[in-house]
């Protein structure tokens, strides 16, 4: 198998990897084409399937090439090298491998590795969240012949299934705009790039997609045991890698749950009168569950989250981030301190870096995307200002959009409050960016169709 000594960054992609990659890509695309052929007879939405898989795989290859030849390594390579040491340990001594992946990281367990297996990077080994990524990658490396390129592509392919499930779910609710929704969920350039490598973000975005899909299936009453299982696994991945994502998801989930029940009530007085009750119950249950998960959430627990955000924000704007820092101002880790910075943080999370803040090609691409999102949001904002009632009616009559909107707002504030570095920001936005763009598209289409109907009615008069 292809071997590289640990603690030496990969300088190039070996020809062996390209040969194995060709085989895997042909195999994956062959299976995708066969699956699309079977499914498209039942549902025309599968016309996007092969194209989505191909673009996802191509994005992974581009990610690897850019990180090896442009960035000369990075966290993605460190994840790979740490996972490779686990894979070697799995092959050499499966008992010690089970010990390492099931027990806490200790110095004693660290020395279960040796020169024949290579050693995991210490800063990843002793961080449970980063080491979890390496644990997930170890079996993938085994079937990828321990190739960085091939294992990245396989992970990217696996993550695509969650994106596809969410795409089909949203299209089922909002038919007729599948092409536009495919741009948001399957073909958004920054989401494809940052969600196609060996990074936390690839796994967490896929977990978010599976979470929303399973929650919707649970509410719809379709195979609830399977939905609960998927929901549990997705939540476990989020808690294990980035717990604050679950914190952003949970309040909207509770609102969606209660709102879906109330929306079935036919009497408008009862239905709209219950709205304050919905939000109160969502807050109480959400706060209670997140508090109960305190130990699992660690530094992102309810009582420590604000302090964590403040400390992280101050760190990410230090000089050693080489000029890519920005500053929304320091804030106290209190409710009042967060409330004062929430609007600025939300703008950061949703729309920055602005195009004039780009310092390299990758940042420029993100800036161009953000400019489009900003213009779309401004067009929608104008409609909201001139008729706020219609906007809130749209949200309350569409629990899925209400959920995605609340998740986008909460997550953008969390990211904006805890990030002061554009390099980190473009990656941290991934778990909510595509969902936020979906919200913009659905709301924009709602107003566009409303205007078209109004013009048609005026013409008929």
For each predicted feature, which ranges?
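Juxtamembrane segments of multi-pass membrane glycosylation machinery
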Residues: 7-9, 111-154, 353-358
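Hydrophobic, aromatic-rich transmembrane alpha-helices
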Residues: 28-33, 345, 349-355, 366-394
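Transmembrane-helix motifs of polytopic, lipid-linked glycan transferases
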Residues: 31-37, 139, 150-173, 375-379
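Membrane-interface helix-loop-helix junctions at transmembrane boundaries of multi-pass membrane enzymes
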Residues: 37-39, 172, 222-226, 379-406
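Extracytoplasmic catalytic/substrate-binding loops of multi-pass membrane glycan-assembly enzymes
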Residues: 67-82, 91-114, 124-136, 342, ...
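Membrane-interface alpha helices of multi-pass inner-membrane proteins
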Residues: 192-193, 214, 219, 227-249
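Short acidic/glycine- and proline-prone juxtamembrane loop motifs at membrane-interface regions
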Residues: 197-200
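Alpha-helical transmembrane segments and terminal signal-anchor/GPI-anchor hydrophobic tails
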Residues: 236-369
């Amino acid at each position: 198998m292809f071997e590289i000594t640990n603690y030496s960054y990969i300088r190039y992609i070996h020809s062996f990897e390209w040969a194995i990659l060709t085989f895997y890509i042909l195999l994956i695309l062959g299976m995708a084409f066969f699956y699309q052929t079977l499914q498209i007879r039942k549902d025309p939405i599968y016309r996007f399937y092969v194209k989505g898989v191909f673009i996802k795989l191509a994005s992974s290859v581009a990610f690897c090439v850019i990180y090896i030849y442009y960035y000369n390594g990075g966290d993605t390579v460190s994840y790979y090298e740490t996972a490779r040491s686990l894979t070697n340990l799995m092959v050499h001594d499966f008992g010690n491998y089970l010990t390492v992946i099931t027990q806490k990281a200790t110095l004693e367990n660290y020395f279960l590795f040796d020169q024949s297996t290579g050693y995991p990077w210490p800063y990843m080994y002793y961080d449970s969240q980063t080491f979890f990524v390496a644990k997930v990658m170890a079996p993938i490396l085994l079937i990828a012949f321990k190739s960085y390129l091939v294992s990245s592509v396989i992970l990217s392919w696996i993550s695509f299934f969650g994106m596809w499930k969410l795409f089909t779910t949203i299209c089922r609710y909002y038919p007729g705009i599948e092409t536009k929704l495919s741009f948001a969920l399957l073909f958004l350039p920054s989401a494809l790039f940052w969600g196609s490598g060996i990074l936390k973000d690839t796994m967490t975005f896929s977990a978010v997609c599976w979470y929303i899909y399973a929650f919707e299936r649970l509410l719809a009453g379709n195979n609830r045991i399977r939905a609960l299982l998927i929901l549990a696994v997705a939540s476990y991945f989020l808690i294990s890698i980035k717990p604050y994502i679950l914190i952003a998801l949970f309040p909207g989930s509770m609102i969606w749950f209660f709102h879906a029940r109330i929306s079935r009530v036919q009497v408008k007085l009862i239905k709209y009168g219950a709205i304050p009750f919905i939000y109160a119950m969502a807050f109480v249950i959400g706060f209670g569950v997140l508090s109960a998960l305190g130990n699992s959430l660690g530094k992102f627990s309810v009582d420590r989250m604000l302090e964590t955000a403040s400390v992280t924000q101050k760190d990410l704007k230090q000089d050693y981030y080489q000029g890519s820092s920005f500053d929304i101002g320091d804030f106290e880790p209190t409710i009042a301190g967060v409330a004062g910075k929430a609007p600025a943080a939300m703008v950061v999370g949703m729309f920055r870096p602005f195009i004039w803040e780009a310092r390299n090609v990758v940042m420029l691409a993100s800036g161009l995307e953000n400019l489009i999102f900003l213009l779309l949001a401004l067009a929608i904002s104008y409609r909201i200002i001139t008729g706020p009632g219609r906007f809130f009616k749209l949200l309350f009559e569409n629990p899925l959009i209400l959920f995605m909107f609340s998740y986008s707002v909460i997550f953008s504030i969390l990211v904006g409050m805890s990030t002061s570095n554009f390099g980190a920001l473009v990656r941290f936005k991934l778990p909510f960016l595509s969902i936020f763009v979906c919200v913009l598209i659905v709301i924009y289409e709602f107003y566009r169709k409303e205007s078209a109907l109004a013009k048609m009615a005026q013409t008929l008069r």
